[in-house]
Amino acid sequence: MAKEKERIKVVSDNRQARFLYEILETYEAGIELQGTEVKSIRAGKVNLRDGFALLRDGEVWLMNVHISPYDKSSLFFNHDPRRTRRLLMHNWEIRKLIGQVEQKGLTLVPLKMYFKGSWVKVALGLGKGKKLHDKRETLKRRQDDRDMARAMKR
């Protein structure tokens, strides 16, 4: 039997990362979560804006991503909103990332968080930080594209 097309529901998108970094490659990673975190993600209470990923001891860790506490749960059973979460990737992907991050000085940034079927996934971007003039150039290019699209409509 053919495998059904998996449904993808984007929960949070980090648009700021595409402005601050030049994204060279993207990777998909699973994420190790607690029960209340999954419920909070389903409600869309995630902020990826300040997040980044670190490589420690052959594992990938997601830092500084804010998942709000689940409001229908008691305080005792809830999670810490900014706790460090382990990302689940294949060993060969992690080894490849270690080489690129350490040698080339690149950064791992979460681009979006989504449900793939019933699993929570994080799209990680391997990026290089943009300088100020690169950011200005991006803004100019975006404005020019908007102007051209507006002119083509007429």
Curated annotation (Swiss-Prot):
Native source species: Synechocystis sp. (strain ATCC 27184 / PCC 6803 / Kazusa)
CDD domains xref list: SmpB
Transmembrane parts of this sequence: none
PANTHER family on file: SSRA-BINDING PROTEIN, TMRNA-BINDING COMPONENT OF TRANS-TRANSLATION TAGGING COMPLEX
Highest taxon, organism lineage: Bacteria
Keyword field: Cytoplasm, RNA-binding
Matches recorded under HAMAP family: SmpB
The family this protein is said to belong to: Belongs to the SmpB family.
MF GO annotations: RNA binding
Protein name (record): SsrA-binding protein
Location of the protein in the cell: Cytoplasm
